[in-house]
């Protein structure tokens, strides 16, 4: 009986030693736990602005940033095993986990909105301005009366007799006038009749002698005797010469040729050279 008990005890002891040798001691695992804490700070600044206040404005509530979620950190799991029961030496493993710190986020309450200040501007003083009196009305003087119409000078024409010894005006038979003679083409004369320069004996007296009167001029129709170097001709006053001065007279071609080449009959061919003489000097004439 004793030998069997010892044998059994020896076997159990050997088995326990074998198990103790085969299973090493497991180290204690280290578990790390990370905690993230978000802190939001609100800073209130007050600024004073000088000037004209604007319209009322309501400040909206401050924006609150949500707290970041806490992410738990899982420790790695150790492989599970089933220990072989041993008699005297039990295998034990202990795991230490650090306590997790509570996650807290403190968000300060938004500051109260500033009081609304309404300023009423002071009324501006009313200035009463009296307009200046209107300027005096300008009185326009009446226009000066128009000058009296200028009347043409009255030319005193000496009375003209019926001719001969009864004529008492200038260039009479007893005191003939001496001047120059020229010729012209005739046409409508100042006395109101046409003048044929190639077919009649007609003259134009100087304007200084006849005056401004034309159709009813007393000299119109009077007879004049003209003498030049022994040649004498009688002509009728039918026109007025505006370019003649002094005692110079103008006449038709027909009369001019008669005085220059008399008694040769007047023809265009025989008297063509006479026109080159132009103005003839030293001619006497008088009314008859």
From Swiss-Prot:
Residues 48-161 are annotated as: Disordered. Keywords: Allergen, Glycoprotein, Secreted, Signal. The keyword Aminoacyl-tRNA synthetase does not apply. Residues 48-107, 117-129 have a biased composition (Low complexity). It comes from the Eukaryota. Glycans are attached at residue 268. Residues 1-20 form the signal peptide. This is Allergen Asp f 7 homolog. Coiled coil: none annotated. The keyword Hydrolase does not apply. It comes from Arthroderma benhamiae (strain ATCC MYA-4681 / CBS 112371). It is found in: Secreted. The lineage of its organism: Eukaryota, Fungi, Dikarya, Ascomycota, Pezizomycotina. InterPro entries: Expansin_CellWall (IPR051477), RlpA-like_sf (IPR036908). GO terms for cellular component: extracellular region. SUPFAM superfamilies: Barwin-like endoglucanases.
């Amino acid at each position: 009986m004793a030998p069997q008990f010892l044998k059994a005890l020896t076997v159990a002891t050997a088995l326990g030693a074998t198990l103790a040798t085969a299973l090493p001691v497991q180290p204690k695992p280290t578990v790390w736990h990370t905690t993230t804490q978000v802190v939001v700070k609100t800073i209130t600044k007050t600024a004073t602005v000088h000037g004209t206040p604007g319209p009322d404005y309501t400040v909206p509530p401050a924006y609150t940033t949500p707290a970041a979620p806490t992410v738990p950190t899982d420790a790695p799991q150790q492989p599970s095993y089933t220990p072989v029961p041993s008699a005297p030496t039990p295998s034990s493993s202990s795991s230490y986990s650090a306590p997790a710190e509570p996650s807290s986020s403190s968000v300060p309450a938004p500051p109260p909105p500033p009081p609304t200040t309404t300023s009423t501007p002071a009324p501006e003083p009313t200035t009463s301005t009296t307009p200046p009196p209107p300027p005096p009305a300008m009185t326009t003087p009446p226009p000066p009366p128009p000058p009296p119409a200028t009347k043409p000078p009255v030319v005193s024409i000496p009375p003209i007799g019926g001719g001969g010894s009864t004529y008492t005006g200038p260039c009479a038979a007893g005191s003939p006038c001496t001047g120059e003679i020229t010729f012209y083409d005739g046409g409508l004369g100042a006395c109101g009749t046409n003048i044929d320069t190639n077919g009649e004996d007609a003259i134009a007296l100087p304007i200084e002698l006849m005056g401004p009167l034309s159709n009813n001029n007393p000299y119109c129709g009077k007879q004049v005797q003209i003498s030049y170097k022994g040649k004498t001709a009688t002509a009728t006053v039918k026109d007025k010469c505006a370019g003649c001065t002094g005692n110079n007279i103008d006449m038709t071609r027909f009369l001019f040729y008669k005085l220059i080449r008399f008694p040769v009959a007047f023809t265009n061919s025989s008297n063509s050279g006479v026109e080159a003489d132009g103005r003839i000097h030293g001619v006497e004439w008088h009314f008859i």
